[in-house]
Amino acid sequence: MSTAVKAGIAALVLLAVAGLTMLFMHFWMAPPDDLDLSREKPSANQLYTVAVAPEQEPFDRNTLHAWIATVKAADGSPVDDAKISVDGGMPQHGHGLPTAPAVTEALGEGRYRIEGVRFNMSGWWELKLHVSAAAAQPEPLKDRG
């Protein structure tokens, strides 16, 4: 058997395994029983509370739409100088977002417009916002000498 034929067979086997894995994840991986569908959550480090909502409801699946993120400090004050990156995906299917959403505008009062969001199929999607702002950074240690 030639090397090219072996490589072709290996590629087909790899595709079959990948396809079966995706099929398994799609049909047999159930969302967790305690899935929290709230649109407002504290950040992992408890420095912020972040709320998200679509700019217009209802939004259509498989179309681009915008979301508004509202970022507040732990004391409830709006965070207007945040840098926000957007990530996410479909944990049940094991893939990321089909687009690359990004913050396109700071709206004031801790609100930010995120454009380029598209959910191309029904199911459980996650939007993960990574937030950083100078106001919530820990203060440097001071020399007590």
Give, region by region, the residue ranges found by the protein language model:
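Contiguous segments within soluble domain cores/interaction surfaces
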Residues: 2-14, 18-126, 130-145
